[in-house]
């Protein structure tokens, strides 16, 4: 009996129904709830699993390098990045007929292949890789790191190498090591790689271990560094006629502040990037020496927080009690980490297209679209997770006595005001934005398009102008040649920046109008509503006027029995569950907007977006319907083409998505009755009744069915849009 799954919960292991299996899977990673768990084992398990996570990441990235080296066309792509399609890997499928073999044989390959839309070719090229041998070397190195990570994970589970709880709670040492060691040293090392390998590579010099010490990255060597003439490193940058990867038009500078983009590659100057990483390294190396450890110098975070008492006393006791609250709650720490990572991931999406760092990636439109969408969806899931763990913190770890009248307690004290303000903002945005869209639809439907309400986003245009965009005619700050800001930066970084902002060949500061104004507010509605649901879930997690004892029921409960009305659907988990739908919805609008605006930009018919985006039918007809027409003809009565796989995935995504509703709209009793009928029939059917079950079949719990429904909804939604995005972009631009 003791060996039945799940071993971490004897109570569940003895459950005679199928609940044992599903609850076992659901709580497998909730280490806190396991039998015999101690704080020490909890920290050690999580620590060891981090090494497992690293091993998986290194193995996966190693696989990317290996498959491109083995089955890709990296060396051919390097010769002509703009016209050769990068191959991710070969496809071996015995079911392919001749038309499919021909359709998927591209990029100079001998057989069917997948095209890479991940940007790895551009990245590897930019950082100095040139041959398949380089890729194999990288793959082997990452495989080695993966093995080391696995060994480290195993080692830290052995009694002799298990760290103590005090080691895990030594926040100052951890911060110092992470700031200096992880961020500082790795940024410095990356600067070194860029200066010694990537920049020479961009100038036609092939630097590897065998000649690393004999090729100087800069003709003056280390002389200027030791004599304080650092400005020499910025002199003689690459010229505007520089051909990337060749000495033609190349300079000698290694650390510059040029601004703008390399004219040929349309990506940031490598020498600017190296300079940026050096500055980051310096900042983080300093930051990693700020906190007090064994040496008695530096800041104590606890002292810093305790000293932060707001003036005037109107904000209570400020940060008192926060240090111990955060340091003793893994959920609080995870919530903070997820919130930060979520913001960073969304920023990556925004900056990868507007300020592309990798050579030629800006001209690979499908990759640009795929990377933007990928990072925004990832950000959405990470951000909702931050609030989920924030809510679990309030339920499991929050101690009111420890946090009396500090910022946390005051958030809870003022939750009604916070939630109602968010609600008001959401309602205002929703009704006004929808009102404008629907009004415009009615005007077009009634044949009076001139009566649309079209609002110019003058404040946003003013901000763009302040940053140097001249087309709107605002004479302000960087768009005014007389301003001190303009004159101060004139000789340093501004020429490159101003050229980039005012050139129409990139995505920096796109021209905006009434359609942008409307969709911006639709997105704001989505963001505020998602935030409202998440914030309400976390702030009401401990209890509310309706259910003051909510925290005693845990993070996810369906209801408090039939006798207590209104207690269904109000667990913190339910808030997370509802918020994910809104999150997906919002990111849908974000990616629709980004994609449609860019498709019209790349095709040179921007007026289509400008004219059709001001009413709902325009979005449905001229974005969704028009761009799916090519996709759904991936296979038809006349044959198939290279979009057929995306056409199939588009269909399949819709099916997965629709399956979600089966779990979301029918409730537990229906399934329980159905299961009992099926079990009755099974037991009375010859042959079938030879198969017996150890666990009595029962329906999923309400919460579990919602999770399964949500998973299908999310996965189907993302698969559908991914297929649409990649097919509609690659179908137009190759």
Curated annotation (Swiss-Prot):
This is Photosystem I P700 chlorophyll a apoprotein A2. GO terms for biological process: photosynthesis. It is a multi-pass membrane protein. [4Fe-4S] cluster binds at residues 559, 568. Its main location: plastid. It catalyses: reduced [plastocyanin] + hnu + oxidized [2Fe-2S]-[ferredoxin] = oxidized [plastocyanin] + reduced [2Fe-2S]-[ferredoxin]. P700 is a chlorophyll a/chlorophyll a' dimer, A0 is one or more chlorophyll a, A1 is one or both phylloquinones and FX is a shared 4Fe-4S iron-sulfur center. Belongs to the PsaA/PsaB family. InterPro entries: PSI_PsaA/B (IPR001280), PSI_PsaA/B_CS (IPR020586), PSI_PsaA/B_sf (IPR036408), PSI_PsaB (IPR006244). Chlorophyll a B1 binds at residue 654. The lineage of its organism: Eukaryota, Viridiplantae, Streptophyta, Embryophyta, Tracheophyta. It is an enzyme of class 1 (oxidoreductase). The keyword Cytoplasm does not apply. It comes from Glycine max. SUPFAM superfamilies: Photosystem I subunits PsaA/PsaB. The gene is psaB. It is found in: Plastid, Chloroplast thylakoid membrane. GO terms for cellular component: chloroplast thylakoid membrane; photosystem I. PsaA and PsaB bind P700, the primary electron donor of photosystem I (PSI), as well as the electron acceptors A0, A1 and FX. PSI is a plastocyanin-ferredoxin oxidoreductase, converting photonic excitation into a charge separation, which transfers an electron from the donor P700 chlorophyll pair to the spectroscopically characterized acceptors A0, A1, FX, FA and FB in turn. Oxidized P700 is reduced on the lumenal side of the thylakoid membrane by plastocyanin.
């Amino acid at each position: 009996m003791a060996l039945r799954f799940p071993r971490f919960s004897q109570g569940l292991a003895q459950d005679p129904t199928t609940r044992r299996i599903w609850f076992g899977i659901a709580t497998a990673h909730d280490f806190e709830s396991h039998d015999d768990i101690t704080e020490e084992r909890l920290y050690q398990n999580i620590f060891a699993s981090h090494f497992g996570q690293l091993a998986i990441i290194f193995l996966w990235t190693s696989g990317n390098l290996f498959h491109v080296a083995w089955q890709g066309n990296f060396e051919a792509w390097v010769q002509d990045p703009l016209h050769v399609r990068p191959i991710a890997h070969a496809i071996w499928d015995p079911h392919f007929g001749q038309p499919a073999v021909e359709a998927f044989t591209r990029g100079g390959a001998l057989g069917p292949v997948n095209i890479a839309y991940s940007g790895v070719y551009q990245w590897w090229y930019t950082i100095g890789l040139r041959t398949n041998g380089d890729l194999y070397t990288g793959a082997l190195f990452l495989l080695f790191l993966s093995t080391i990570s696995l060994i480290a994970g195993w080692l830290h589970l052995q009694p002799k190498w298990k760290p103590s709880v005090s080691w895990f709670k030594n926040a100052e040492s951890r911060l110092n090591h992470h700031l200096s060691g992880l961020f500082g040293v790795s940024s410095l090392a990356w600067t070194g790689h860029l200066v010694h390998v990537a920049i020479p590579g961009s100038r036609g010099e092939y630097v590897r271990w065998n000649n690393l010490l004999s090729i100087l990255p800069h003709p003056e060597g280390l002389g200027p560094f030791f004599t304080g003439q650092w400005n020499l490193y910025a002199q003689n940058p690459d010229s505007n006629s520089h051909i990337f990867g060749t000495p033609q038009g190349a300079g000698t500078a290694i650390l510059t502040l040029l601004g703008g983009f390399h004219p040929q590659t349309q990506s940031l100057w490598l020498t600017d990037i190296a300079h940026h990483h050096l500055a980051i390294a310096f900042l983080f190396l300093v930051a990693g020496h700020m906190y007090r450890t064994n040496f008695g110098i530096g800041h104590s975070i606890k002292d810093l927080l305790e000293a932060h008492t707001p003036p005037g006393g109107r904000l209570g006791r400020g940060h008192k009690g926060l240090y111990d609250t955060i340091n003793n709650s893994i959920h609080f720490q995870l919530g903070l980490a997820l919130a930060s990572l979520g913001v960073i991931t969304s920023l990556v999406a925004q900056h990868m297209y507007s300020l592309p760092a990798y050579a030629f990636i800006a001209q690979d439109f499908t990759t640009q679209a795929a990377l933007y969408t990928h990072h925004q969806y990832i950000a959405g899931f990470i951000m909702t997770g931050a609030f989920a763990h924030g809510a679990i913190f309030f339920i499991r770890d929050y101690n009111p006595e420890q946090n009396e009248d500090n910022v946390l307690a005051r958030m809870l004290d003022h939750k009604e005001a916070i939630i109602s303000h968010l609600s008001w903002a959401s309602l205002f945005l929703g009704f006004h934005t929808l009102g404008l869209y629907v009004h415009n639809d009615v005007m077009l439907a009634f044949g009076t398009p001139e009566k649309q309400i079209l609002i110019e986003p003058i404040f946003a245009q003013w901000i763009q102008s302040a940053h140097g965009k001249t087309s709107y005619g605002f004479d302000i700050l960087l768009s005014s040649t007389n301003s001190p800001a303009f004159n101060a930066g004139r000789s340093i970084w501004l020429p490159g920046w101003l050229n980039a902002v005012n050139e129409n060949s990139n995505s920096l500061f796109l021209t905006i109008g009434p359609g942008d104004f409307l969709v911006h507010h639709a997105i704001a509605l989505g963001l505020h509503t998602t935030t409202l649901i998440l914030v309400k879930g976390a702030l009401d997690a401990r209890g509310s006027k309706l259910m003051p004892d909510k925290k005693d029921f845990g993070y996810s409960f369906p209801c408090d029995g039939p006798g207590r009305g209104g207690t269904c659907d109000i667990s913190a988990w339910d808030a997370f569950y509802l918020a994910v739908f809104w999150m997906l919805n919002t990111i849908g609008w974000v990616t629709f907007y980004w994609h449609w605006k860019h498709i019209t930009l790349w095709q040179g018919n921007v007026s289509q977006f400008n004219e059709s985006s001001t009413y709902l039918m325009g979005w449905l007809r001229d974005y969704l319907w028009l761009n799916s027409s090519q996709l759904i003809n991936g296979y038809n009565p006349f044959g198939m083409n290279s979009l057929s796989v995306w056409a199939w995935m588009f269909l399949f995504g819709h099916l997965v998505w629709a399956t979600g509703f089966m779990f979301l709209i029918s409730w537990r009793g229906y399934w329980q009755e159905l299961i009992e009928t099926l079990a009755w029939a099974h037991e009375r059917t010859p042959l079938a009744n030879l198969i017996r079950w150890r666990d009595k079949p029962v329906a999923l719990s309400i919460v579990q069915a919602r999770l399964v429904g949500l998973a299908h909804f999310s996965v189907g939604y993302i698969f559908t849009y991914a297929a649409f995005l990649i097919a509609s972009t690659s179908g137009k631009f190759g």
